[in-house]
Amino acid sequence: RGLGDVYKRQMYTHFDKRILSVTHDVTSLLSLGENVIGVQLGNGWYNHQSTAVWFFDKASWRNRPKFTAQLHLRYTDGTTEYLGTDSTWQTTDSPVIFNSIYTAEHYDAQKELAGWDSPGFNATGWYHAQETESPTETIKSQVMHPIRETARYTATQCKKINDSCYVYHFPQNIAGVTELKVKGKKGTKLRLKHGEL
């Protein structure tokens, strides 16, 4: 189960000067027995690859994405245990083979791993995570609200351009994420382009 309707948690900052941390209460997500924490790590603002007038692709901090977490467990007897990320975590490539805040996300559904974030998953062939240095020792709590889903819109119009191109019109100019259901042959490529009038 995910952590709600949030699409983008980590906000922009000068990553070589400070890192923004977020806190979540995961109590309701725990169950008796084995539990698993799964993370999908993207480039975000830290490893911005697309060129733009702001030159984020040339930022001094730009590097491979990194992740750290600490789980605080408070037991009924009053004791506390801390579990942190380290090299016992396991990692592999995901179906998201490219992602950029400005340009696109490339998703290969043939690489989906059912149950990868569930107890009992067979992670044979996965790699142990590599411990690495933080870009800075300054960690601050993120106080701004994350980007989250606030509404859903359905296309109101569909115009066929040719056998491989359709234009869908939505009733509102938004910043959002497209959701679609399709049927087709395995390996078929779909390309979504977003625009505004």
Language model feature labels by segment:
Residues 2-7:
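Short, small-residue-biased leader/transition segments that mark boundaries at the very start
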Residues 24-190:
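Mature extracytoplasmic enzyme cores
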Residues 1, 190-196:
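Short, surface-exposed beta-strand/strand-loop-strand elements in extracellular ectodomains
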Residues 8, 12-32:
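Aromatic- and Gly/Pro-enriched, solvent-exposed loop/edge beta-strand patches characteristic
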